Amino acid sequence: MSTGFNAQSFLRTVTSSAGVYRMYDVKGDVIYVGKAKDLKKRLSSYFRKNLGNVKTQALVSHIHHIDVTLTHSETDALLLENDYIKQYMPKYNVLLRDDKSYPYILLSQHEHPRLAYHRGPQREKGHYFGPYPNGGAVRESLHLMQKLFPIRQCDDLYYKSRTRPCLQYQLSRCSAPCVGKVSNAEYDEQVKLASLFLKGKDKQVISELVAKMEEAAEQQAYEQAARFRDQIMALRRVAEQQEVSGNTGDMDVIGVHYASGIACFHLLFIREGKIFGSRSYYPTVPAQTDIEEVLRSFLLQFYLNADIQRTIPKEVVISHHFEELHELEAAVSEALNKKFSIKTNVRADRASFLRLAITNATNAVMTRLSHKNTVEQRFVLLEEILELNAPIQRMECFDISHTMGESTVASCVVFNREGPHKAEYRRYNIEGITPGDDYAAMKQAISRRFDKIDASGKIPDILFIDGGLGQLRIAQQIVDEKFVNLDKAPQLIGVAKGESRKPGLETLIFGDTETSFSLEDDSPALHLIQHIRDESHRFAITGHRNRRQKTRNTSTLESIPGIGPKRRKALLQHLGGLQEVKGASVAELAKVPGISIEMAQTIHDALRG
């Protein structure tokens, strides 16, 4: 492909200064951003006669023009490069999409503080501990904290409504401050110890508890002394399991594995000398990108584009060394205005945890490659069976779900050559049809999916319909209408269940000819069809159940005079669900915020008939 770019003429205008360059294609899109301490030398390397790298060849073939920005230093160039990558998301750069927020444990500032899971803006007053790599790590920690410190974890609405201790008190996981089972002083002491524990000060917590145990024993308060003893033993067991080293502090340990175009960066988050958990990252890597660029790009984007809620440690240990490591170290330190070091040659505890991170990264890549190869083989076999002239790039499958015609939902799931593409999944709430009419539901769903389709839209190569010939005919009719003026249309295939409805006995039906065929029950191509069919079924059922529950909750309560969305929500949250609301007494209903005794009587009468 020729874009008319005159490289020699351009290079005559480039100086040997440090700076950043942006490469554009003929449409004006930025396709690559790079930096160099010597721009002339770096840019000249793209236009040598013998370019060994396939990625570079492809990149150069699409260059229409190049913009250059000079900087005072290589550190400035690194920072500007990162800003441009974040702004333009160029197709030939390594891109890290880390758009998930990080969860924390919140210790609130109430009279009786609570421990809670928190994700998002830190608006509530209190102490935030973390960040944790994922929600599972937070929930695991909260479960552990319940066993160690009898502090409430219930929400305020539930806490204020209690008239007697809940099950957590019976399990010795909460001291029931809601009903005065513990003094404020005792509760505050446990809150203080929990805070110290979350800060990693296990030894101080244990020392204070030992002193309290001895004091209780001296005063012959043996039951209280036994409680402190049990708490100390539990804390010691946990401390032994979590302890990394006495002097590690805050640190990220990163194991890297890169193979066949898939890169995994597995991070161990160590804060206050404890492992908070781990998380794997998979940056988007253009084909034939060398490992040095993958490493540099990941570290640059991960630490410079960090969510404001994610704390950056002073030390990072990584499994690979690369040429620009020290320049990147300086750039991050300058941008964050704090000391930041990257180490690759480590010993003792750090080496042990680095080996663990590398093992996890390697296993993650191998698993992805195995899955990728398996899915690819299934696609190839399906192409052979269907005698297609071109590879399948996109498949979709539709299914309908309802209960006796109630709350009908249609699902559309999407598979590409790597398997399920969940970002493209869609659900359609079906309206205005005769309840239970699956044909009308399918017609509405297919019509809405392809309502404004054109040649530039996302057209599936194959469209599976989970159903028999009747539903397939409806779908084929709609597709014929919507694609009448387009050169390409999807191949429709119905997936009808066999006589006994057992997997492996499915009958497949072509939509255009209505001819049917079957595949062997051990055929990988059939397994691929079953996978997308089962996924569409699952997605439709979960959507239907959610819609049905919402409809039933809403219609039952909001049919009562005086009950709107706000009061309905308060009733369901406070009492735990519709069945609990139905079973509540007038007195219990009246304890819900916003519900008077008169309104409680009205609700009680309406629900009891």
UniProtKB/Swiss-Prot annotation:
Keyword Hydrolase in annotation: no
Subcellular location: Cytoplasm
Superkingdom assignment: Bacteria
Keyword vocabulary terms for this entry: Cytoplasm, DNA damage, DNA excision, DNA repair, Excision nuclease, SOS response
Principal location: cytoplasm
Any Pfam family matching the protein: HHH_5
Keyword DNA repair attributed: yes
Xref: SUPFAM superfamilies: C-terminal UvrC-binding domain of UvrB, GIY-YIG endonuclease, RuvA domain 2-like
GO molecular function, one term: DNA binding
InterPro entries given in the database record: GIY-YIG_endonuc, GIY-YIG_endonuc_sf, GIY-YIG_UvrC_Cho, Hlx-hairpin-Hlx_DNA-bd_motif, RuvA_2-like, UVR_dom, UVR_dom_sf, UvrABC_protein_C
Residues making up the signal peptide according to the UniProt record: none
Domain annotation UVR: ranges: 203-238
Gene3D superfamilies in UniProt: 5' to 3' exonuclease, C-terminal subdomain (1.10.150.20), GIY-YIG endonuclease (3.40.1440.10), UVR domain (4.10.860.10), UvrC, RNAse H endonuclease domain (3.30.420.340)
One Gene Ontology cellular component: excinuclease repair complex
CDD domains found in the cross-reference section: GIY-YIG_UvrC_Cho
Gene Ontology biological process terms, A to Z: DNA damage response; nucleotide-excision repair; SOS response
Domain GIY-YIG: 16-94
Database matches in HAMAP family: UvrC (MF_00203)
Functional summary from the UniProt entry: The UvrABC repair system catalyzes the recognition and processing of DNA lesions. UvrC both incises the 5' and 3' sides of the lesion. The N-terminal half is responsible for the 3' incision and the C-terminal half is responsible for the 5' incision.
Self-association state and partner proteins as the record states: Interacts with UvrB in an incision complex.
Family classification: Belongs to the UvrC family.
Matches recorded under PANTHER family: UVRABC SYSTEM PROTEIN C, UVRC/OXIDOREDUCTASE
Name this polypeptide is given: UvrABC system protein C
Organism: Shewanella oneidensis (strain ATCC 700550 / JCM 31522 / CIP 106686 / LMG 19005 / NCIMB 14063 / MR-1)
